[in-house]
Amino acid sequence: MSRSAGNAYDYVIVGAGSAGCVLANRLSEDPSVRVLLLEAGGRDRSPKVKIPAAFPQQFKTKLDWDFATEPEPHVDGRELYVPRGKMLGGSSSMNAMLYVRGRPLDYDGWEAQGAPGWGYADVLPYFIRSEDNVRGASAYHGAGGPMRVSEQRSPRTLNRRLLDASEAAGIPRIADYNGPEQDGVSMFQVTQKNGRRFSAADAFLRPALTRPNLDLRTRVLVQGVEFDGERAAGVRIARGRRGSEVVPAAREVILSAGAIASPQLLLLSGVGDAEELRAAGVAPRHELPGVGRNLQDHPFVTVIWEITGEDTLYGADRPRHLAEWLLRRSGKLTSTVAEVCAFTRTRGGLPAADIQFHMGAAYFEDHGQEEHDGHCMVIAPVLVSPQARGQVWLRSADPRDKPRLLTNALSERDDVESMLAGMRLAREIAGQAPLRDLITTELRPGDAVKDAPELEADLRRRLMLIYHPVGTARMSDTHELAVVDSQLRVHGLQALRVVDASIMPTIVGGNTNAPTIMIAEKGSDMIREAA
């Protein structure tokens, strides 16, 4: 193992995903500090990254970490697919570009769980700071920030019917689900600029790469954190087939590798549950049993109909649609597949929506890998506040081995009931006058699936995760399984922070990219204030 000469860098950031790109930008704003950003993947130049509707084509390619859970006991023993971006921008270069912040009560809940300074009033300024919203500046939105938030450029005409049918089914129309109220139906806001994906790499990293005090290294496998006593002194990276090199950090090491890789790196570094570490062949360094626990994700299932006579994404792969996108950045290929969003409560007594609907003019099954020859419509209920909790743990002491994951999806009866209610409500929306006459047949679950046992069996057979893993380095000053404190410092260690979706105590009620960017914006201020 070799050691880089001197303390060349003040901050070493692991992971050039959504959080890492923000941190690299904000920390390097100070010209007196040196920042190194390390990324295991490569560049984000692929057309599959830039063309919005092509995001499912990235799945299970070299752009994807391609994680999967262990056999999940409550979904017929299936392994659930968990894609994660392996390139600059991380999953912001792979996701569906849906800009959703979550609910004020989500963040107030974080504060109540031992994270002072993370209530909604505290985090809202960081959402605003990061944003360049085409709607302009307001009490809830920013203009002139790095991240472009747009209206959809070429929405499907079916969206009007989806909005009207949702309203007819009792879901009110809402102007802005990222404002003070979330419940209702509206069009998705998207992280696109002129019909093209606008990732965290586009927004935060590329403008900062001209700075002489920021270095970026891609295709670097980080093997773990190096310590000097209880202080993080740098990171160990792979060099060649068998060698390694230590990259020192004079001030801090910051893990921003995401909710799967950040806990994996802590565990590989000997930080975690000592008994589990020994079982994986890792010598324990610091007992912190919460590392990898508290894994949460949003499960979803699709309800799909074949329809007639509407503008759908069927045939979007034809050359004329590619030509339209290349020449005008418009047309079907600007679609995020899910174009209409609804948040609703499926029963009384809930403090907030338990279901989010992703609606679109497309056939979307098996993560977009399954095809259907015909025009379709999908309404997919997503469980936004799951009670199930899972874990990330090591498969071995080899950093090249993917960690083991288990979400325990559908292990809690309340989760099952909310999902079943969401499937029924999807059918109710489709049965309203604006949509009813378009439908020729229900493809998923299918017209024959009617009674409760059949519907639940279908749910367990087809349930998927919607790519929002969080919670595996829980933030709290007081919780017994907390990994980081409210300043995002790893408990019991020095000069080591986790700044990404791992730190969420509970998953937010909506998509997770915007909250991850917010976490990094707030975390960057904490790091600079501590310097």
Where is each model-derived feature located?
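N-terminal redox-cofactor-binding region of secreted/periplasmic oxidoreductases
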Residues: 1-531
